[in-house]
Protein backbone atom coordinates (compact mmCIF):
# COMPACT_ATOMS: atom_id res chain seq x y z
CA UNK A 1 0.00 0.00 0.00
CA UNK A 2 0.87 3.70 -0.06
CA UNK A 3 1.18 5.83 3.08
CA UNK A 4 1.86 9.32 1.71
CA UNK A 5 5.64 9.40 1.25
CA UNK A 6 5.71 10.10 -2.48
CA UNK A 7 5.22 6.61 -3.90
CA UNK A 8 2.20 7.26 -6.15
CA UNK A 9 3.22 10.25 -8.26
CA UNK A 10 -0.19 11.82 -7.57
CA UNK A 11 0.07 14.89 -5.29
CA UNK A 12 -3.62 14.78 -4.37
CA UNK A 13 -3.45 11.13 -3.33
CA UNK A 14 -0.27 11.75 -1.36
CA UNK A 15 -1.86 14.68 0.48
CA UNK A 16 -4.96 12.63 1.25
CA UNK A 17 -2.93 9.74 2.66
CA UNK A 18 -0.90 12.08 4.86
CA UNK A 19 -3.93 13.95 6.18
CA UNK A 20 -6.19 10.93 6.66
CA UNK A 21 -4.10 7.91 7.70
CA UNK A 22 -7.26 6.35 9.10
CA UNK A 23 -8.20 5.43 5.52
CA UNK A 24 -5.40 2.87 5.68
CA UNK A 25 -5.56 2.10 9.37
CA UNK A 26 -9.25 1.31 9.85
CA UNK A 27 -9.49 -1.66 7.44
CA UNK A 28 -6.35 -3.20 8.97
CA UNK A 29 -7.79 -2.80 12.45
CA UNK A 30 -11.21 -4.12 11.46
CA UNK A 31 -9.96 -7.30 9.74
CA UNK A 32 -6.59 -8.07 11.37
CA UNK A 33 -6.90 -11.77 10.54
CA UNK A 34 -7.59 -11.10 6.84
CA UNK A 35 -5.59 -7.99 5.96
CA UNK A 36 -1.85 -8.24 6.57
CA UNK A 37 -0.48 -4.96 5.32
CA UNK A 38 2.77 -4.03 3.60
CA UNK A 39 3.64 -0.58 2.29
CA UNK A 40 5.98 0.95 -0.24
CA UNK A 41 9.08 2.83 0.83
CA UNK A 42 10.68 5.74 -0.98
CA UNK A 43 14.46 5.82 -0.63
CA UNK A 44 14.48 9.24 -2.32
CA UNK A 45 12.84 10.48 0.89
CA UNK A 46 14.92 8.97 3.67
CA UNK A 47 13.41 10.93 6.59
CA UNK A 48 9.87 10.30 5.39
CA UNK A 49 10.53 6.60 4.90
CA UNK A 50 12.18 6.24 8.31
CA UNK A 51 9.23 7.97 9.92
CA UNK A 52 6.82 5.69 8.03
CA UNK A 53 8.70 2.59 9.20
CA UNK A 54 8.42 3.77 12.79
CA UNK A 55 4.76 4.75 12.46
CA UNK A 56 3.45 1.85 10.40
CA UNK A 57 5.77 -1.01 11.37
CA UNK A 58 7.20 -0.37 14.84
CA UNK A 59 4.12 1.38 16.23
CA UNK A 60 1.48 0.31 13.72
CA UNK A 61 -0.23 -2.70 12.16
CA UNK A 62 1.86 -3.21 9.01
CA UNK A 63 3.88 -6.41 8.62
CA UNK A 64 6.39 -5.57 5.91
CA UNK A 65 7.72 -3.20 3.27
CA UNK A 66 8.03 -3.15 -0.50
CA UNK A 67 10.73 -1.44 -2.54
CA UNK A 68 9.27 -0.62 -5.99
CA UNK A 69 11.08 -1.00 -9.29
CA UNK A 70 9.31 1.79 -11.16
CA UNK A 71 7.59 5.09 -10.52
CA UNK A 72 8.72 8.01 -8.38
CA UNK A 73 9.95 5.87 -5.47
CA UNK A 74 12.14 3.46 -7.45
CA UNK A 75 15.75 3.23 -6.27
CA UNK A 76 18.08 0.35 -7.12
CA UNK A 77 18.36 -1.87 -4.05
CA UNK A 78 22.16 -1.59 -3.95
CA UNK A 79 21.98 2.20 -3.74
CA UNK A 80 23.44 3.57 -0.50
CA UNK A 81 20.14 5.30 0.31
CA UNK A 82 18.37 1.96 0.59
CA UNK A 83 20.71 0.43 3.16
CA UNK A 84 19.67 2.44 6.28
CA UNK A 85 16.02 1.72 5.54
CA UNK A 86 16.72 -1.99 5.21
CA UNK A 87 18.69 -1.91 8.47
CA UNK A 88 15.75 -0.30 10.25
CA UNK A 89 13.28 -2.87 8.90
CA UNK A 90 15.61 -5.76 9.73
CA UNK A 91 15.83 -4.58 13.35
CA UNK A 92 12.04 -4.80 13.52
CA UNK A 93 12.00 -8.29 12.00
CA UNK A 94 9.56 -7.30 9.25
CA UNK A 95 9.19 -8.70 5.74
CA UNK A 96 11.16 -7.05 2.91
CA UNK A 97 10.04 -7.45 -0.70
CA UNK A 98 11.97 -5.99 -3.62
CA UNK A 99 10.60 -5.59 -7.14
CA UNK A 100 12.98 -7.29 -9.56
CA UNK A 101 12.98 -7.62 -13.32
CA UNK A 102 15.41 -8.56 -16.07
CA UNK A 103 14.72 -6.69 -19.31
CA UNK A 104 15.91 -7.54 -22.78
CA UNK A 105 18.62 -5.03 -23.59
CA UNK A 106 19.22 -4.17 -19.95
CA UNK A 107 17.68 -1.71 -17.54
CA UNK A 108 15.45 1.02 -18.91
CA UNK A 109 15.06 2.98 -15.68
CA UNK A 110 17.58 4.23 -13.14
CA UNK A 111 15.69 2.80 -10.18
CA UNK A 112 15.22 -0.76 -11.43
CA UNK A 113 16.65 -3.76 -9.56
CA UNK A 114 17.57 -7.27 -10.65
CA UNK A 115 17.65 -10.51 -8.66
CA UNK A 116 21.45 -10.38 -8.74
CA UNK A 117 21.39 -6.97 -7.08
CA UNK A 118 18.93 -8.17 -4.46
CA UNK A 119 21.22 -11.13 -3.77
CA UNK A 120 24.07 -8.67 -3.22
CA UNK A 121 22.00 -6.74 -0.69
CA UNK A 122 20.68 -9.86 1.05
CA UNK A 123 24.19 -11.20 1.64
CA UNK A 124 24.71 -8.32 4.06
CA UNK A 125 21.84 -9.60 6.22
CA UNK A 126 22.18 -13.40 6.11
CA UNK A 127 19.72 -14.00 8.94
CA UNK A 128 16.89 -11.93 7.47
CA UNK A 129 14.59 -13.09 4.64
CA UNK A 130 14.12 -11.08 1.46
CA UNK A 131 11.47 -11.69 -1.20
CA UNK A 132 12.49 -11.41 -4.86
CA UNK A 133 9.26 -10.14 -6.42
CA UNK A 134 8.33 -11.65 -9.79
CA UNK A 135 11.41 -13.92 -9.70
CA UNK A 136 13.02 -11.32 -11.95
CA UNK A 137 10.49 -11.86 -14.75
CA UNK A 138 12.99 -13.88 -16.74
CA UNK A 139 12.63 -16.55 -14.09
CA UNK A 140 15.33 -19.01 -15.17
CA UNK A 141 17.93 -16.29 -14.86
CA UNK A 142 16.34 -14.94 -11.70
CA UNK A 143 16.32 -18.30 -9.93
CA UNK A 144 19.98 -18.85 -10.77
CA UNK A 145 20.89 -15.37 -9.52
CA UNK A 146 19.52 -15.93 -6.01
CA UNK A 147 20.05 -19.70 -5.75
CA UNK A 148 23.18 -19.44 -3.62
CA UNK A 149 21.75 -16.86 -1.20
CA UNK A 150 19.57 -18.93 1.11
CA UNK A 151 17.74 -15.99 2.73
CA UNK A 152 16.20 -14.88 -0.59
CA UNK A 153 12.81 -16.28 -1.61
CA UNK A 154 11.15 -15.88 -5.00
CA UNK A 155 7.61 -14.61 -5.52
CA UNK A 156 5.59 -16.09 -8.36
CA UNK A 157 3.53 -13.29 -9.93
CA UNK A 158 3.77 -10.76 -12.72
CA UNK A 159 4.63 -12.77 -15.82
CA UNK A 160 2.69 -15.19 -18.00
CA UNK A 161 2.19 -18.72 -16.72
CA UNK A 162 4.95 -20.85 -18.22
CA UNK A 163 5.48 -24.59 -17.95
CA UNK A 164 8.48 -25.48 -15.83
CA UNK A 165 8.76 -22.33 -13.71
CA UNK A 166 7.56 -23.74 -10.41
CA UNK A 167 9.23 -27.08 -11.03
CA UNK A 168 12.59 -25.40 -11.58
CA UNK A 169 12.14 -23.16 -8.55
CA UNK A 170 11.34 -26.15 -6.32
CA UNK A 171 14.24 -28.13 -7.73
CA UNK A 172 16.80 -25.33 -7.41
CA UNK A 173 15.59 -23.53 -4.28
CA UNK A 174 13.24 -25.86 -2.43
CA UNK A 175 9.54 -25.19 -1.95
CA UNK A 176 10.28 -23.37 1.31
CA UNK A 177 11.85 -20.51 -0.67
CA UNK A 178 8.84 -19.76 -2.90
CA UNK A 179 5.86 -17.53 -2.06
CA UNK A 180 2.70 -17.13 -4.12
CA UNK A 181 1.70 -13.72 -5.41
CA UNK A 182 -1.47 -12.71 -7.27
CA UNK A 183 -0.42 -9.30 -8.69
CA UNK A 184 -4.06 -8.24 -8.39
CA UNK A 185 -5.72 -6.28 -9.86
CA UNK A 186 -3.52 -6.13 -12.95
CA UNK A 187 -3.15 -9.89 -13.43
CA UNK A 188 -5.64 -12.76 -13.58
CA UNK A 189 -5.91 -14.58 -10.26
CA UNK A 190 -6.73 -17.79 -12.11
CA UNK A 191 -3.62 -17.48 -14.25
CA UNK A 192 -1.41 -16.82 -11.25
CA UNK A 193 -2.91 -19.70 -9.26
CA UNK A 194 -2.47 -22.06 -12.19
CA UNK A 195 1.30 -21.62 -12.03
CA UNK A 196 1.26 -23.48 -8.72
CA UNK A 197 -1.87 -25.63 -8.90
CA UNK A 198 -0.95 -27.17 -12.27
CA UNK A 199 2.73 -27.64 -11.42
CA UNK A 200 4.17 -31.13 -11.23
CA UNK A 201 5.03 -30.93 -7.53
CA UNK A 202 3.59 -32.49 -4.38
CA UNK A 203 0.47 -31.24 -2.60
CA UNK A 204 2.61 -30.44 0.43
CA UNK A 205 4.87 -28.24 -1.70
CA UNK A 206 1.84 -26.47 -3.16
CA UNK A 207 0.53 -25.68 0.33
CA UNK A 208 3.87 -24.22 1.31
CA UNK A 209 3.98 -22.00 -1.76
CA UNK A 210 0.33 -20.93 -1.67
CA UNK A 211 0.41 -19.61 1.87
CA UNK A 212 2.35 -21.42 4.55
CA UNK A 213 5.71 -19.92 3.65
CA UNK A 214 4.46 -16.34 3.69
CA UNK A 215 2.56 -16.89 6.93
CA UNK A 216 5.78 -18.17 8.46
CA UNK A 217 7.62 -15.02 7.35
CA UNK A 218 4.89 -12.88 8.90
CA UNK A 219 4.93 -14.86 12.12
CA UNK A 220 1.27 -15.79 11.70
CA UNK A 221 0.31 -18.81 13.81
CA UNK A 222 -2.85 -20.75 12.99
Predicted regions and their residues:
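Active-site gating/metal-coordination segments in enzymes
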Residues: 7-104
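Short beta-strand segments
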Residues: 1-2, 40, 131-133, 155-156, ...
